[in-house]
């Protein structure tokens, strides 16, 4: 019996890890990866950090260059797909080539959510999703240049830190009343706001751009009436899933390809993962997790589902952010206002805990990354704690 052919569409973390997971889980059939980027699949997190700060930055590949050939995975880089061929099971490229598939994994990622008022500036305006974006930003982030960043989420704040470290004059504009409002708890939001302000970043909350004039400098008029002059304008206000191919194939989409817990779409032969995917939960709600670890997890889950193997258990959601000399790691449930703090954030060393009826459901570490491993185990097991003991620095966490 002829082994099936699996095609992976995409060139990022989820795509590369899907290939690795399929081989690790025993798939020996024909395996192809198609990407519109010319690079081998590379890590995205460094784009807003080391790729802007290091003297001679190099892309960090997800898998070693020799892995692909050694594992008999056919790479098709720098190609554009015309259609997925859902009905014919023939993926078609714009150059006319067609490739048969039995199962398909879509990991086309996402683009920056557009902001038409700024997009009209053309090359004067920047977003950050790919290596080319980082290279262009690196060229313009020069000392003493005025940089305006729209959006104070994770990417916006990481860019603010990197631009400040490159000795730029940075202003951040945020529509909400706080920074990192979607994915950090209130005490961490307050810490980050203060941290950036102490570094010289001007952060304007509850504000937005109303008018833009392009000249020698970009003139930005805010809702507050203030006018800013910028040499460089960057925005990061969310993502727009690269779902066009899936939409044209009549797959269910909702700013993302809708998948179930097995990463399966409405077509049982087509799977999706990473930033392009959005999961329908048991209660019918749609949930997207935009993180490096989620891309890895969904790649492993999809590979298992494709091969008819038991699905791996999902660990608590986890991501990290490096800003200035700080490493923050977020794990578990970030919702809720009643967080406990172990340590002193003013010394840039602390852990915030989220207890619900004594059960640890989430945590954020500040320059305490070594503690994430036991915290992950505690969250997974539903461990209960005495709050006073948890925040007592005289008691080692590992002894609890």
Curated annotation (Swiss-Prot):
NAD(+) binds at residues 146-174. InterPro entries: FAD-oxidoreductase/Apoptosis (IPR050446), FAD/NAD-bd_sf (IPR036188), FAD/NAD-binding_dom (IPR023753), FAD/NAD-linked_Rdtase_dimer_sf (IPR016156), HcaD (IPR023744), Reductase_C (IPR028202), Ring-hydroxylating_dioxygenase (IPR053382). Keywords: Aromatic hydrocarbons catabolism, FAD, Flavoprotein, NAD, Oxidoreductase. FAD binds at residues 5-36. Signal peptide: none annotated. It catalyses: 2 reduced [2Fe-2S]-[ferredoxin] + NAD(+) + H(+) = 2 oxidized [2Fe-2S]-[ferredoxin] + NADH. Pathway: Aromatic compound metabolism; 3-phenylpropanoate degradation. One of its GO terms (molecular function) is 3-phenylpropionate dioxygenase activity. GO terms for biological process: 3-phenylpropionate catabolic process. GO terms for cellular component: 3-phenylpropionate dioxygenase complex; cytoplasm. Its EC number is 1.18.1.3. Its cofactor is FAD. NCBIfam families: 3PPDioc_HcaD, PRK09754.1. Part of the multicomponent 3-phenylpropionate dioxygenase, that converts 3-phenylpropionic acid (PP) and cinnamic acid (CI) into 3-phenylpropionate-dihydrodiol (PP-dihydrodiol) and cinnamic acid-dihydrodiol (CI-dihydrodiol), respectively. This dioxygenase system consists of four proteins: the two subunits of the hydroxylase component (HcaE and HcaF), a ferredoxin (HcaC) and a ferredoxin reductase (HcaD). Belongs to the bacterial ring-hydroxylating dioxygenase ferredoxin reductase family. This is 3-phenylpropionate/cinnamic acid dioxygenase ferredoxin--NAD(+) reductase component. The gene is hcaD.
